[in-house]
Regions:
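Hydrophobic, helix-prone linear segments
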Residues: 1-82
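Vicinal oxygen chelate
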Residues: 1-2, 8-11, 32-36, 57, ...
Length: 323
């Protein structure tokens, strides 16, 4: 099934304004206040019946020469009213598993952006740091905002990303990381059940980064901890979509059960496909289980869509829609 790059990451929050303001003022996002989500979205997200409304705001990255103004790679901030909530990945440790760990963006001036975010109360797993991994040479910081939101900001030296805003304004979301305990099951899910394309796989051993500052692993364990990594992209998409990481030597808590609505954190990723109903049937034909069956609903500002979702073996919700 032909799929476009990440359309948006849906982020559940306690307070929309608290997360939106620094993303707008520092990172260059443009906001659109949306109508509340319709009743069909409540059902698709398995929202408890006591929820009275789903408030929404869309944050779209500023266009650049590298990334035109097509609305992709956006952040949809949602607030569930009238229900009890907790943070999905509560302690934010990079060796905990379950759900969606972060979303990834490019910046031409990572340090400027991160230092400005710190003035809004943001922190990070560690300091911005240069490192090389596989064919990539980058500078990176994994920034931590409010409400369980983790944002990996990447300044890529090689291969260089041409046409980014020179002041550091963030690119669209192009990738998202999931920390898993069963690497083989996650690889089968994305590679076989969803038929995503495996872009690369590698093992990380006997290096400090990405570990000490990127993931907050304490020394000497940052060097000693063996990690497996795989990057998948949907068929037809020009950019990567899902990065899987397993830490073989450091083990934390599993947060799978908490990574659902109306809890707070990165709720799901959304991808546009040619034919959502047909893709759902393909997934079921390969033995996959749907989290939400295809439904027709209005998703502002996209319009009337057919949408369904799946849930990975460790609780990451992935939505697919077609216009």
């Amino acid at each position: 099934m032909q799929t476009k790059p990440v359309q948006e990451a849906v982020v559940s929050v306690f307070d929309i304004e608290r997360l939106a303001r620094p993303l707008i003022e520092v990172c260059g996002y443009v906001e659109t206040v949306l109508p509340d989500a319709p009743s069909e979205q409540f059902a698709a997200w398995h929202v408890p019946s006591e929820c009275t409304r789903i408030e929404q705001r869309l944050l779209v990255p500023s266009p650049s020469e590298a990334f035109p103004a097509d609305g992709r790679g956006a952040l949809r901030l949602v607030r569930f009213h009238g229900v009890e909530q907790k943070v999905m990945r509560s302690s934010q440790r990079s060796w905990d598993t379950g759900g969606i760990f972060d979303v990834d963006v490019f910046s031409a001036d990572l340090d400027r952006v991160y230092r400005a975010l710190q003035r809004h109360g943001w922190t990070a797993m560690g300091e911005p740091v240069d490192y090389s991994e596989a064919m990539f040479s980058v500078r990176q910081v994994v920034a931590i905002g409010p409400d369980g939101f983790v944002l990996a900001i990447i300044q890529r030296y090689e291969p260089f990303v041409e046409g980014l805003d020179p002041t550091g304004l963030l690119s669209p979301v192009f990738n998202s990381t999931q920390v898993v305990s069963d690497f083989d099951a996650a690889v089968r899910f994305y590679g076989e059940t969803l038929d995503f394309e495996l872009q690369m796989t590698c093992k990380i051993e006997d290096v400090v980064e990405p570990g000490a500052d990127v993931l907050g692993l304490p020394l000497p364990h940052a060097r000693d901890a063996r990690r497996e990594l795989a990057i998948f992209k949907p068929q037809g998409a020009s950019e990567g979509g899902i990065e899987l990481v397993r830490n073989l030597d450091m083990h934390g808590k599993r947060w799978d059960a908490e990574c659902i609505a109306p809890n707070v954190g990165i709720l799901c990723l959304r991808f546009e496909v040619d034919d959502a109903a047909a893709y759902a049937a393909e997934i079921e034909g390969r033995g996959g289980v749907l989290y939400a069956r295809p439904v027709t609903l209005e998703v502002a500002p996209l319009g009337i869509v057919t949408l369904f979702s799946v849930r990975s073996p460790e609780g990451a919700i992935i939505e697919f829609y077609s216009l």
